[in-house]
Every structure is written in C-alpha cells, then in structure tokens.
Swiss-Prot record:
Top-level taxon: Bacteria
Protein name: Ribonuclease Y
KH domain residues: 210-273
Claim: Transmembrane helix is one of the keywords in the record: yes
Enzyme Commission number: 3.1.-.-
Domain HD, residue spans: 336-429
Gene giving rise to this polypeptide: rny
Length: 520
C-alpha cells in the first residue's frame, strides 16, 4: 500500500515537474523570441538608417560626378569650338591667299603674254637684222676677195695657220717649262734618295789579285813539289789548270791563274799535300778531288750566308750555289759577290724610299750579275746567261727584267729595274770600288783627250775626276750652240766604241763667248 502511494506520489511529482518545466521553458522561449524580435528590429532599423545614409552619400557622389562630367564636357566643347574657329580662320586665310595667288598668277600670265608678244616682235627684228647683216657680210666678203685676191677658204686657212702657230709656240713653251720643273724636282728627289742610300750603305774598298801564295815549312819542300823530272808539278798543273811558280822566294810557292775557283782548289790541295808530306801523282789526284769537294761545299755555304745577310729567302738551291761562285769572280778588281750585295742593299734602300717592294728589290739587285758566275763556261754575255738562269729557276718577272735591262740591253718595265741599274752604276763608279793598272789608267785619260781634240773647232780638252768626266773647250766662232750638242753626242759615241772603262764618262762641251771693249 505504501509502495503504491509512493509510486503515485512520484508520478504526481514528475507530472507536476514536467508541467512546471514546460511552462518555464515556454516562458524562457518566449523571452528569447521577444529578445530576438527586438534585436532583429534593432538590426533592421540600423540597416535602414545605414541604407538611407549610403543612399544619400551615393546621391551626393552621383551629383558631384555629374557636375564634374558636365564641367569637363563643357570645357571640351569649348576647346573644340575654339579649335574649329581657328581652323575656320586658317581656311579663310588660305582661301584669301589662294585668291591673292590667283590674282598674281593672272597678272604674271598677262605679263608673260606681253613678253611673248614682245619677244616675237624682237625675233622678227633680229631675223630682219640677220638678213641684212648676212647681206652686208656677203658684200664685204665679196669685196675682200676682190681686193685680196683670196677666197674665203684661203683666208680662213691663213688665219687658222697663224693661230695654230701661235698656240703651238705657247704649248711648246709650257711643255718645256713643265719638263724643266719636273726634271728639277725629279733630280732633287733622286739625289736625296741616292744620298740617303749611300749614307746607309757601308761598302768595302775591294782589291783582288790573280795569284795565291802557299807557305812552305822549308825550301826543301820545293823539290818534293816538283818531283822526279817534274812529274808532281806537271800533275798538279794538269789537274787544276793553275801555273805553279817556284822561284827564289823563300819558303813560298806562287799559284797563278785567272780562274779563282781553280786557283783556290789548287791552293787547298797543295796545303794538304805539304801538311801530309806524301807528294806523288796518285796522292795529288786524291787531294785535288777532295779539295774540289771542299770548295764546292764552301761555295754553297757562301751562297746561303749571302742570302741570309741580304734577307732573301726561297732561292733555288742550284741558284744559291751559283751565287756563291760569285765570290771568286772579279770585275775591274771588284769582287762580284760584294758588288751584288752592295747593289742589293742600295736597291732595297731606294725602293723603300719610293714605296716599292723592298724584298723584291733586294732580290733583283742580288741576282743582277748572276750570269758572271758561269759566263766563262757558257757561251753568251753575262746578261743573257743571267736571264736564262732566272727564267730556268722561275724567278719573278721583275727580277728577270732587272737582269736583262741593267746594262740597257732592253727597256726596264718596272721601277725596281730602273733602281737596279742605278744601284749597279753607283756601286761600280764609287771611288775605290774598281781598280785599274796605272798604265791602263794613264792610257785611258790620254785617249779621252785625244778623241776629244780630234774634232775641228775644239780648242782644248781636260780629262778630270779620275777619267769619269771630260770637258771640251770649243772655239765660239767655229762651233755654235747646236753644233756643240752634236759634238758632245759624236764624242760620246766614239768613247763608247773605242774605250773600255768602268762606270760612266760624262762628256761636257763648253762654249764661251767673250765681248771685250776698252774705254779710253
């Protein structure tokens, strides 16, 4: 019974609690709803107020922007109106200018029409005058022909002849003046170049002989050199082609011969025989052959050394060997190899001054006398032989022409060829370069004066400057100026044909007229 009551009471209390909780929750919910509604209303009111403010602000901004745009539009319209006004003014001004130009052109056209009418009238007047002048000229020509007995063509020919003669004299005078001026300038420049080349080129005074001396340890060696019945000396002379002179000269044997290479071969062979002490025909033959090989090798070395000193490269080996043989060749006592090197240096220096190829100039100068190395072995002049050698070994055409023209046998085709000829003459003619015997020297001077004085009208002649110039004084009553030129040419030809001399000889004919009066 009590449990049931308690259950009922519990149920009742639970029910009452549920009802009370329901109402409490309801009241709380209503309160929340009311608060939310109030909050929503407040938010809505705030939003409405903010929207109203934004609306007002937007309206104000829109009004400001509309005002700004309106102002800019008005300014742009004003500017466009101003620009249009300016364009309109310019167009009006151009129109006015065009109107003025039209007026000016109309005036000019009228003036041109007037001038054209005037020119037509003048042309008619000129034609009338020309017709009258032509008639007058024809009358004058007819009258002149009648008076002078000359036709128009004859008179024209005479006048043209006089004019041509006057012009030819004037042209000749101008040409002569130009030639004199050019010659003076060329001579001055040539002297400067030659002086510079000579100052920069140091050359030796050359003196060569045709004999060699072999020193002996004692005079008993002379008998051994001669051998039994002279067989040793005959063998040596036969193999070398050199004369052995054994005289009273103590402890010396003289080798005489005009071929320096054979003389050098004999000297070396005899030196070796004397040092060896075994002198008999077989040994002599062996030593001579060995000496020939040594001389050939020495000649090759000399050729190579020469090309190195001169600064030339690319020569054919055979040509180098032939070049070395020039060491044993002389011309009027001047060593040909030294002479060729001197010509090479001079040609190179002058070519450098003129802006030509210096190396090619040196090459041409060094090889200009290459034919002299074998001219005693091959038929022909040294110029012809040199040209053949240069052609055979494919030298430069300028080098070949320089060899061919350095003695005037052919015309030079390049400046270098002319320089080679000048350097050759300069090297040969300088003092001390070439030598002659005293007898030949005196005989040549006497012959120079004899040739000069053999002509009629020559008063006296003098050979000066060691025979390199001859001055001839002539009688002015017998020889005039033109005859003096002819006399100089004739004497020059006779000297070239009758005398043998190194370098050049200058022939000067002097004609002097003196007028003397005495005042009393």
């Amino acid at each position: 019974m009590s449990n049931t009551v308690w259950i009922l009471i519990s149920i009742l209390l639970a029910t009452v609690g549920a009802v009370v909780g329901f109402f409490v929750r309801k009241s709380i919910a209503e309160a929340k709803i009311n608060g939310a509604a109030n909050e929503a209303k407040r938010i809505l009111d705030d939003a409405n107020r903010e929207a109203e403010a934004l609306k007002k602000e937007a309206l104000l901004e829109a009004k400001d922007e509309i005002h700004t745009l309106r102002t800019e539009a008005e300014l742009e319209i004003r500017d466009r109106r101003s620009e249009l006004q300016k364009q309109e003014n310019r167009l009006m001004q151009k129109e006015e200018n065009l109107d003025r130009k039209d007026e000016t052109l109309d005036k000019r056209e009228q003036m041109l029409e007037k001038k054209e009418e005037s020119l037509v009238a003048r042309q008619q007047q000129i034609e009338e005058l020309e017709s009258k002048v032509g008639e007058l000229v024809q009358k004058q020509q007819t009258e002149l022909e009648r008076i002078s007995n000359l036709t128009r063509e004859q008179a024209k020919s005479i006048i043209l002849g006089k004019v041509e003669n006057e012009l030819s004299h004037e042209i000749a005078a101008m040409v002569k003046e130009s030639e004199v001026r050019a010659k003076e300038e060329a001579d001055k420049k040539a002297k400067e170049i030659l002086s510079l080349a000579m100052q920069r080129c140091a050359a030796d005074h050359v003196a060569e002989t045709t004999v060699s001396v072999v020193n002996l340890p004692n005079d008993e060696m002379k008998g051994r050199i001669i051998g039994r019945e002279g067989r040793n000396i005959r063998t040596l002379e036969t193999l070398t082609g050199i004369d052995l002179i054994i005289d009273d000269t103590p402890e010396a044997v003289i080798l005489s011969g005009f071929d320096p290479i054979r003389r050098e071969t004999a000297r070396i062979a005899l030196d070796k025989l004397v040092q060896d002490g075994r002198i008999h025909p077989a040994r002599i033959e062996e030593m001579v052959e060995k000496s020939r090989r040594e001389v050939d090798e020495y000649i090759r070395e000399v050729g190579e050394q020469t090309t190195f000193e001169v600064g030339i490269h690319g020569l054919h080996p055979d040509l180098i060997k032939i070049l070395g043989r020039l060491k044993y060749r002389t011309s009027y006592g001047q060593n040909v190899l030294k002479h060729s090197m001197e010509v090479a240096y001079l040609t190179g220096l002058m070519a450098a001054e003129l802006g030509e190829d210096e190396k090619l100039a040196r090459r041409a100068g060094l090889l200009h006398d290459i034919g002299k190395a074998i001219d005693h072995e091959v038929e022909g002049s040294h110029v012809e032989i040199g040209v053949e050698l240069a052609t055979k070994y494919k030298e430069h055409p300028v080098v070949i022409n320089s060899i061919a023209s350095h003695h005037g046998d052919t015309e030079p085709t390049s400046i270098i060829a002319v320089l080679v000829a000048a350097a050759d003459a300069l090297s040969a003619a300088r003092p001390g370069a070439r030598s002659e015997t005293l007898e030949n020297y005196i005989r040549r001077l006497e012959k120079l004066e004899e040739i000069s004085e053999s002509y009629e009208g020559v008063e006296k002649s003098f050979a000066i400057q060691a025979g390199r110039e001859v001055r001839i004084l002539v009688k002015p009553d017998t020889i005039d100026d033109l005859e003096a030129h002819r006399l100089a040419r004739d004497i020059r030809k006779r000297i070239e044909n009758e005398l043998d001399y190194p370098g050049h000889i200058k022939v000067t004919v002097i004609r002097e007229t003196r007028a003397v009066e005495y005042a009393k």
